[in-house]
Amino acid sequence: IGYFTNLFPNDPPTFVVMEARAADCLYQGALAGDGQPRIVEGDLKTIMAGLACGEPNILSWDILRNHVSAFVSCPDWVSARGMRMLGVPVKGDPTVISGESGAVGMGLIAAIMETDEYKELREAIGLDRFSQVLMFSTEGNTDPMKFRKVLWDGEYPTV
């Protein structure tokens, strides 16, 4: 985020941070609106194990709170949908084998574009059918059994 903000200081990209709902410390900090980070405690159970920290990195918090357009707290079905979409893409798109934490971006983009629940967010960040989106999947198939349950058995359905 810092890199792209410095690269395009007059017209930076729109940044969206996605977190597992069970461990949404950055989202909670942004929601509080006082500039202070938040720690989420308790049961951090989520399929997005790589995002289940519950405590923000203090050094990055300042950059995030100043340059991110939206923080989104995502339920597990968002990640599962992203895994399915990446793993079984539409004709012509490449297959991407992404784990739960890496696929949340794809699932969120789909939810933002396809559901009224995210209409306000879609408008706030200026996302439309002409937008160019760059996503990073930071995780491969780290749990083959869970991957199969999500893709083959429909675990965490969207409907």
Q: What function would you assign to each model-found segment?
A:
Residues 1-66, 116, 121-159:
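Glycine-rich phosphate/pyrophosphate-binding loop at beta-loop-alpha junctions
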Residues 56-125:
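Active-site-adjacent helical/loop segments in soluble small-molecule enzymes
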